[in-house]
Amino acid sequence: MSILKVVAERLVIHPHPNADALELAEVGRLRAVVAKDAFRTGDHAVYLPEGSVLPEPLIAELGLTGRLAGANKDRITAVRLRGELSQGIVCRPKALADLDLAAAAAAGTDFAEVLGVTKWVPPIPVHLAGDMHPAEDLLPWLDVENIRRYPAMFTPGEPVVATEKIHGSACLMTLVAATGTVFASSKGFGKQRLAIKEADGNLYWRAIRAYDLPRLAAAVAADLGAARVGVFGEVYGRGVQDLGYGVQASTRPGYAVFDVAVDVDGEIRWLTPDEVAAFTAAHDVPAVPVLYRGPYDEAKLAELAEGVETVSGTGANIREGLVVRPATERYSPVTAGRTIGKLVSTAYLTRKGGTEYE
């Protein structure tokens, strides 16, 4: 899940092909359905992204009482409106009526706090939870931004690697090389430097043991001279999320490495896709499928994000999407951090009965 920012954006307005009273407001590569003539191309408005949780007064102001997602009907999700995918909400809240939204857009002003908008945090089911303890040496995972939201993240033609995005639960494992200490955590707890105590029934620990991840991390540490190694992988299967990939997690959970980070002389470095592939193959640990290597082509990658999964080899369910990285790690001024983005399939966004646990 990405970082929540509520900012003003310059809009490009398109006709809605199926409704005379509606139009499509484009933000980046995302589009949100709006009332006809509410905005013109070049106007600036506030964009409330997917995953935003809105306060009741703002929901009422927007005329959306009872129409949003979640138990409290307060969460923005992707929906189809008259056949067109609508992602996020474009609006001009009364609380910002006196502001110059064009200037705010140029400054990148974040209105989340002013508007009372918060980020939705996925619930943690019992089989993923456990007793927690502080773990300052734990290497956390980061937020992956939506490429359609930030299309300038990659340069056309730059060498990239795209892997399949698996719908499971991210398992963070850190090995401290000097002591052999192993920490396990989730995305959310990892950000707080909290680890889950080892337990037979915990899904993360079951995956760590089943795939002998400490052995992989120890080999990486030895080869690269790392003090700490973070192995980041997706635990998946029936019982983890709604997409099962033909695996019954209650017997042996599915698992695939999607990233590895090392601490060498106090500097954190993310391994390149080729390095991750080499280490996982050498130690018989599954890795997420690589679906594309080559020059960055947004249209081609967006098409590749659709379809069925390739993890099981049987096309057991829809594909969640892609995660795209440069072939060589680099800094992104767009995200002010690591260059890594995702493209999520339309089928995944609009599926019915989906689960979104951490």
Residue spans of the language-model regions?
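Core nucleotide-handling region used for phosphoryl-transfer chemistry
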Residues: 1-358
